[in-house]
C-alpha cells in the first residue's frame, strides 16, 4: 500500500488532514495572484467612470478589465506587462472584483458588449473596440492598442 503524506491543520476548532499536494496547490495559487499584481504594477488602476469619460471625451485610451482570481486574466496580464515595458504604453486597469464598481461595471459591459474577462478595450475618437481573448499574442496586443 502506498503511503500518502498528510498534513494536519485546524480551523475553528475542527481538525483536518489534507494531502501534502493540497498545500502546494494553495501556495502556488497564492503566488500566481501575487504575480498578477506584479504584472499590472505599471498599469493605472482606474474606474468605470474614467473609461466612460474617455469614450465621451473622444480620447485615445486603452483599458484592461480583469481580476486576480481569473486564470485567463493572469495569462493575459503577463503578456500585457511585457508589452507595457517594451512600449512604455499608458494602459488603465479596471478591477472587475471591486465591490464599489460592480453595478457600474455590469452596465458598462452590457453597453459595450464585454461578455467576459479579460476585457481589452481601445478607445479612439469615441470609437470603442473590444476584445476578450486571453490568447492574444504580444504582437496582437500591440496592434489592437495601436502601439
Whereabouts are the PLM-identified features?
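N-terminal leader/targeting and pre-domain segments
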Residues: 4, 22, 27-61, 147
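Short, positively charged and aromatic/hydrophobic N-terminal segments
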Residues: 11, 16-22
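Local sequence-structure signature of Cys/Sec-based thiol-disulfide redox active-site neighborhoods
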Residues: 50-87
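Thiol-based oxidoreductase modules, predominantly thioredoxin-like and allied folds used
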Residues: 65, 89-104
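Short Fe-S-cluster ligation motifs
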Residues: 99-117
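Non-catalytic, surface beta->alpha helical segment in thiol-disulfide oxidoreductase systems
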Residues: 116, 121-147
Amino acid at each position: 500500500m502506498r503511503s500518502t503524506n498528510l498534513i494536519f491543520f485546524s480551523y475553528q476548532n475542527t481538525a483536518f488532514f489534507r494531502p501534502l499536494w493540497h498545500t502546494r496547490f494553495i501556495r502556488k495559487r497564492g503566488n500566481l495572484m501575487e504575480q498578477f499584481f506584479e504584472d499590472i504594477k505599471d498599469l493605472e488602476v482606474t474606474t468605470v467612470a474614467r473609461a466612460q469619460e474617455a469614450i465621451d471625451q473622444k480620447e485615445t485610451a486603452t483599458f484592461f478589465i480583469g481580476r486576480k482570481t481569473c486564470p485567463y486574466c493572469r495569462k493575459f496580464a503577463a503578456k500585457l506587462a511585457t508589452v507595457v515595458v517594451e512600449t512604455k504604453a499608458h494602459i488603465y486597469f479596471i478591477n472587475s472584483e471591486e465591490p464599489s464598481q460592480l453595478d457600474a461595471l455590469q452596465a458598462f459591459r452590457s453597453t459595450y458588449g464585454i461578455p467576459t474577462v479579460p476585457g481589452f478595450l481601445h478607445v479612439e475618437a469615441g470609437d470603442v473596440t473590444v476584445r476578450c481573448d486571453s490568447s492574444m499574442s504580444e504582437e496582437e496586443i500591440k496592434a489592437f492598442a495601436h502601439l
